[in-house]
Design a protein with these regions (language model features):
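Active-site residues of response regulator receiver
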Residues: 62-63, 93
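Short, glycine/charged-rich "phosphate-handling" switch motifs in NTP-dependent
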Residues: 110
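Conserved Asp/Asn-Gly motif in the active-site loop of CheY-like receiver
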Residues: 38-42
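Conserved phosphotransfer cores of two-component systems
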Residues: 51-55, 79-86, 107
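Conserved active-site segment of CheY-like receiver
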Residues: 14, 91-96, 116
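Receiver (REC) domain active-site loop signature in two-component systems and cognate sites
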Residues: 66
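Non-catalytic signal-transmission and effector/linker regions of two-component phosphorelay proteins
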Residues: 1-10, 16-34, 49, 53-56, ...
Length: 139
């Protein structure tokens, strides 16, 4: 019996190009973690609650600007749910606004990353995040 030591990553982002860039960055950075995708906060909560994503070793990469339920609304709902409140979340957004950062950290996010414009910078960002999360899981 083998033990799955990979972190299951849920990308919550409505922008098709950003989703494609994350997938490409995973491939280019040789990141083998399972990647799930939700279009918005409502879909993400449904996936987390219905078992679509294993409960152990999961990380949410969260955009802030989305329809139906934005990232901050998602964080509030997530932290209010006893079954989900401990889920690790890293904000991955184009917003460099201090107000957005403060509001996200108010909901105990593990990090706040601004999406780089250049693809190679994006690959480096995803690879670094993967290394960091792997080290944190080993601790």
């Amino acid at each position: 019996m083998s033990i799955d030591r990979k972190t299951h990553i849920l990308l919550v982002d409505d922008d098709e190009i950003d989703v494609m860039n994350v997938r490409r960055a995973f491939e280019k950075g040789k990141i083998e973690n399972p990647l799930f995708h939700a279009e918005d906060g409502l879909e993400a909560l449904e996936m987390l609650r219905d078992g679509s994503i294993p409960k152990e070793r999961r990380l949410v990469l969260l955009d802030l600007n989305m329809p139906r339920m934005n990232g901050i609304e998602f964080l509030k709902e997530l932290r209010d749910d006893p079954a989900l409140h401990g889920t690790a979340v890293v904000v991955l957004t184009t917003s460099d606004e201090e107000r957005d950062r403060l509001e996200a950290y108010h909901f105990h996010v593990a990090g706040y990353l601004v999406k780089p414009v250049r693809f190679l910078s994006f690959v480096e960002l995803m690879t670094t995040l993967n290394r960091y999360w792997t080290l944190m899981e080993m601790a």
